[in-house]
Amino acid sequence: MADDKKQLLIVTGMSGAGKTVVAHDLEDMGYFVVDNLPPTLLGSFWDYNSNDFHKVAVVIDLRVKTFYTDLLDEVNSLEDNGNVQATILFLDASDDVLVARYKETRRLPPLANNGKGRLLDGIQEERRILMPIKNRSNYIINTSNLSTKDLKQKLINTFSDRKRQPFSIEVMSFGFKYGMPIDADIVMDVRFLPNPFYIPELRPFTGLDKRVFDYVMNKKETQVFYQKLLDLLETAIPGYIKEGKEKLTIAIGCTGGQHRSVSIAQQLARDLSKKYPVDITHREVSRYIRK
């Protein structure tokens, strides 16, 4: 979507096709979202609010049978304003999928004749009324076979000005006695490994010191554990990426966050950086730097 014009995205379509889900996704993408705006108020809303937000999305659904003429009139009027790019996104789904969704939620479509008519009749009448809007739409997304994750990615690919952020990893060392990091996705406890704390000449230093690092990493039990950890992560990380994860935080903890966790985190960051962007944080190291 053009960057030199303010962006107005109009989200409409079949009831039950996912407008509420899309509204939440657009908010995550930085849009200011207004739900259930009557079509006749679209122009007035834009006049009063266009200067406050660069990206605006309005969700409009079927309320009256003049819906499509009102909406098209408002869109045509807005397009006469050279400072706005009005885009219509139409959400659709097959009749059988919509019927199944309505039965699951125990709700009725707007044109179901107050519950007296057949569910499918209401859906088909709504589809007929919305056809002019569908034909006028810039984008049509059929959600019949889309998971919520797939739908969000399709929205990002189509409407986000940042697209999808590249996947990255943060490796963090920490000390359990200072509390676990609350933002970690994976936490590994390495307190079972040999502890340099009990080696007097190593005690004052951290895992950033080569002597401490070599002591920890050259132990057989460390090498066995580390290889299994690396194998696990190399198996799991592609799955996180597939699920849409943009940043994965891996926390390695020992008692004080000074020796073992720092050493393991250093090696892990080094190995993972061969495939992925990696940042490393040693949460407790500043506690042990001699001043």
UniProtKB/Swiss-Prot annotation:
GTP binds at residues 61-64. Keywords: ATP-binding, GTP-binding, Nucleotide-binding. GO terms for molecular function: ATP binding; GTP binding. ATP binds at residues 13-20. Belongs to the RapZ-like family. Displays ATPase and GTPase activities. This is Nucleotide-binding protein lhv_0732. It comes from Lactobacillus helveticus (strain DPC 4571).
